[in-house]
UniProtKB/Swiss-Prot annotation:
Stored InterPro entries: LIPOR_BchN/ChlN, Nase/OxRdtase_comp1, Protochl_reductN
GO terms of molecular function: 4 iron, 4 sulfur cluster binding; ATP binding; metal ion binding; oxidoreductase activity, acting on iron-sulfur proteins as donors; oxidoreductase activity, acting on the CH-CH group of donors, iron-sulfur protein as acceptor
Lineage: Bacteria, Pseudomonadati, Pseudomonadota, Alphaproteobacteria, Rhodospirillales
Protein name: Light-independent protochlorophyllide reductase subunit N
HAMAP family: ChlN_BchN
Length: 440
């Protein structure tokens, strides 16, 4: 094993042989469930935004050269930049069982921490290869924490993409942190926890809004530094900033925290509903809430109006990729006048998305899971104006004359909150404008 720098309820349906699609019911609306061939992106991708967020953490992937090349390409960094992630590459002797994987991990970690003494939190990240040969990273993390715990905490999680969507890498990472969160004192005042990785600028915006409402005790998970892990307890109320954090939410609830039901903070409507859930839970009066949120709502509404001419009346089709599909469809339909033909999602968490589902029009087809060939047939037949899909489908669809938007770009870009509402709308408008310019 060599070290190479930077090259549930929340789980999607397991893949299987293609079968006839089945219809279920989600609330009072039909839901198309599909099982078959599906396209996914690797869960290791979450490291790209997580390593930028937790500034004293390091992510050590136990994987293959393919993992190393993926990370270098996805992150857009060079080896000499020494980013805070790397791949311990499984060699032939590791795969053949000729070397003790646990000893090799110990050796690589010791070298890493000697070279990078600034690391305070080390994640051992499982991959498809390490899971196939069943390397016990949880045992390795417990052992290494005893050895290096005075200076560096060691935690493990799986970033494998075998049966998950790429955003669930973040879910697995945050869920692994929850057991290490300190316990809040029983007599402490209620506090608010925002769960899900947000760009620092967005986190600061939300922090200011909560403070202006009088919610002073606000924390974010993940924090910017591992030494600032938030304390949680029965008086903790948490808001999910991302819809793909089912495991993390379940772990927080097991420790006594309570989730605040809310739509997700995309666009004016979603952001206002999300903030209102916190305001109601912490006793903020309506006058204060309206005063604090009015400037942001007005700025966002003006920004959205600039994109409405491009998007209004256009038809959009979502392939399942990130679990962001339902909140984004709600945003496009209700705030920009688009028509959603099909909203595909890898997994539909009914409780976490209840507020979003209530806002969707009954005409939109919801689909859970995927049989990619059948879904492509439906997409081609519908001829939508815009398709939101993964990288693997985008180029073939573009070659057929169908305009596409890469779904992964919606995860990498700041899109939450009032100030980013216009940017979010522009991400969808840009492919349509490009297509119009290319027409002869």
């Amino acid at each position: 094993m060599t070290c190479r720098p930077a090259l549930s309820d929340s789980h999607p349906p397991e893949p299987g042989t293609p079968s006839s699609p089945s219809f279920g019911v989600c609330g009072d609306r039909p839901l198309l469930r599909e099982r078959g061939q599906h396209e996914v992106f690797c869960g290791l991708a979450g490291i790209i935004w997580l390593h930028r967020k937790i500034q004293d953490a390091f992510f050590l992937i136990i994987g293959s050269r393919t993992c190393a090349h993926l990370m270098q390409s996805a992150a857009g960094v060079m080896i000499f930049a020494e980013p805070r992630f790397a791949t311990a590459v499984l060699e032939e002797q590791d795969l053949a069982g000729l070397a003790d994987a646990q000893d090799e991990i110990d050796r690589v970690v010791a070298r890493l921490l000697e070279r990078r003494p600034d690391i305070r939190l080390l994640f051992l990240v499982g991959s498809c290869p390490s899971e196939v040969i069943k390397i016990d990273l949880q045992r390795a993390a417990l052992r290494l924490s005893k050895v290096h715990g005075a200076r560096t905490r060691v935690v493990s999680y799986s970033g494998s993409g075998l049966e998950t969507t790429f955003t669930q890498g973040e879910d697995a990472c945050l869920a692994a942190l929850v057991p290490d969160l300190p316990s809040a004192a029983a007599d402490e005042a209620p506090d608010l926890l925002v769960v899900g990785t947000l760009p620092d600028v967005v986190e600061d915006q939300f922090g200011r809004l909560f403070a202006e409402m009088g919610i002073a005790r606000t924390a974010f998970l993940p924090p910017r530094r591992s030494t600032a892990l938030p304390a949680i307890g029965p008086k903790t109320r948490f808001l999910l900033a991302q819809p793909f954090l089912g495991d993390t939410a379940r772990c927080l609830e097991a420790r006594g925290a309570r989730r605040l039901a809310a739509p997700f903070p995309f666009g004016v409507e979603g952001t206002t509903g999300w903030l209102a859930a916190a305001a109601q839970a912490f006793g903020v009066d309506d006058l204060t809430f309206r005063r604090v949120t009015a400037p942001g709502r007005e700025r966002a509404a003006r920004a959205l109006e600039r994109q409405r001419a491009t998007l209004e009346g256009k038809r959009v089709f979502f392939f399942p990729e990130s679990q962001l599909e339902i909140p984004l469809a709600r945003f496009l339909v209700r705030e920009l006048g688009m028509e959603a033909i099909e909203i595909g999602t890898p997994y539909l968490h009914r409780a976490h998305l209840a507020e979003e589902l209530a806002l969707l029009p009954a005409t939109a087809l919801l689909s859970e899971g995927q049989d990619v060939d059948r879904q492509l047939d439906r997409c081609r037949a519908a001829r939508p104006d815009l398709v939101v899909c993964g990288l693997g489908l985008a180029n073939p669809l573009e070659a057929e004359g169908i305009t596409t938007k890469w779904s992964i770009e919606l995860v990498f870009s700041p899109i939450h909150g009032y100030e980013q509402a216009g940017d979010l709308a522009e991400l969808f408008a840009r492919p349509l404008l490009r297509r119009a310019l290319l027409k002869v």
